[in-house]
Amino acid sequence: MAGSNTLSSSEHGDDPRGHSYSIHIQTRGTTLDKYPAKQHARNVARQLGLTDGLIYLMSQSTRTLEDSDQPQPFRQRRYFFYLSGVDEPDCHLTFDIKSDILTLYVPHYDLRKAIWVGPTLRPSEAMMRYDLNAAKTYDELSKNIRTWASKRMSPVIYILHEGQKPNINAHFLAFNHEDLLPAMDACREIKDEHEIDLIRRANEISASAHIEVLLGIRNMQNEAEIHGKFLDTCVSQGARNQSYEIIAASGENAAILHYTKNNEPLDDRQLVCLDAGAEWNCYASDVTRTFPRRPYWPSCESANIYSVVQRMQEECINGLKEGVRYLDLHILAHRIAIEELLSLGILKGGSTEEILQSGASLVFFPHGLGHHVGLEVHDVSPTPLMAFSLDKYKGLPLLSCRPPCTLSAPYLKAGMVVTVEPGIYFSRPALKDARRKPLSKYIDMDVVQKYIPVGGVRIEDDILVTRDGFENLTKAPKGREMLKTIR
């Protein structure tokens, strides 16, 4: 949620194709205020329960592709970014817990690199751009660590992984690679106001790109055009990176959860499932919309399934607030799916509870309801899966579901950002496998055949959990507004 000092503006206009639009731009969280790296470092130290020690992190290094002189696309290590806000390669970071000093070490000036790719980050520039106590060149790192260690009887340096020690030959140093990662995961689980603003901005750009696809979908002939339009819109608004590979799946391809070929003709396929989200300053958005190529549903079957998923999402979103067990919402989504699929004749021969216990709904809804969103699209948390040992759901096959998303923490907390992304899919491999199982008695395969061309429907929004409810950060149109956007 934006603070009272947020600057904002709104721009209104008319698309040349006759569509009115409104874009709301917020400047907070972009370039006007610094990423709160020092506060993040203090939070991690507090989570570690320490009053002394040194945290050391290294950024991603510059690398070339295998057997090539071409550089690998750079992607910053997210834990490093969380304690620095620096999206540059070949840097190092220390946080002196006792002295409360956060220091960035940047590469030494390289004339050849400056000529070929531009100058690297300098200490003076780093101090202006980032929330640091000090910025130095890398050649000072070893000396400074030795100086820090010489003032302590038992110096301990906290690192993420055993293979990420600083390049320093000092036998008297002790390294702890067990405690830092879970402490940082616990801190990253709850987003501060600055982080929420970055996720909000990523969602604004994603919404704009989804709208552009809807405006042009009628004239598109191939999945590649959808991919290209989405990417073009994001890049033109300053978001060069995607949070994940764009999924532009038409027809039966929409039943493939992580379809990324995006190269088939649209022809007369009923629906397109576009799962795509821009990244802004290393923070992700994760947005899915499923839509026809015309401003109406091309079949009763496609309209039916969209309505099912829409109800699943709306009821689960409305149940979000601090203290709610996310697992309960996941189970709620399955109950709704079963009720609706029974009414359509896709499921048969049992009560909602019987079918839930059988696992038959997993054939159509095989993944989790959602996941954390932050520096990773599937962001970290100290408890990566929901509580399997709960007597309430013991033995329920729904708890074994996996991709495209892991299940969130047992209880929601204010400041979490989670997705709610139910879906119903008609996957030929899943249905073929179901025929061989006892649960097949609950599935009317003759009715299912009419729904195969639908492929799949998924609707996904990014939701900020608050103490008394939620805020939906995703503004891309869906439902009736989505159909009205198609021209």
Curated annotation (Swiss-Prot):
It is an enzyme of class 3 (hydrolase). This is Probable Xaa-Pro aminopeptidase CPC735_009100. GO terms for biological process: proteolysis. It catalyses: Release of any N-terminal amino acid, including proline, that is linked to proline, even from a dipeptide or tripeptide. Residues 1-10 have a biased composition (Polar residues). It holds the Pfam family AMP_N. SMART domains: AMP_N (SM01011). SUPFAM superfamilies: Creatinase/aminopeptidase (SSF55920), Creatinase/prolidase N-terminal domain (SSF53092). The keyword Protease applies. Its EC number is 3.4.11.9. PANTHER family: XAA-PRO AMINOPEPTIDASE 3, XAA-PRO AMINOPEPTIDASE AN0832-RELATED. Catalyzes the removal of a penultimate prolyl residue from the N-termini of peptides. Binds 2 manganese ions per subunit. It comes from Coccidioides posadasii (strain C735). Its cofactor is Mn(2+).
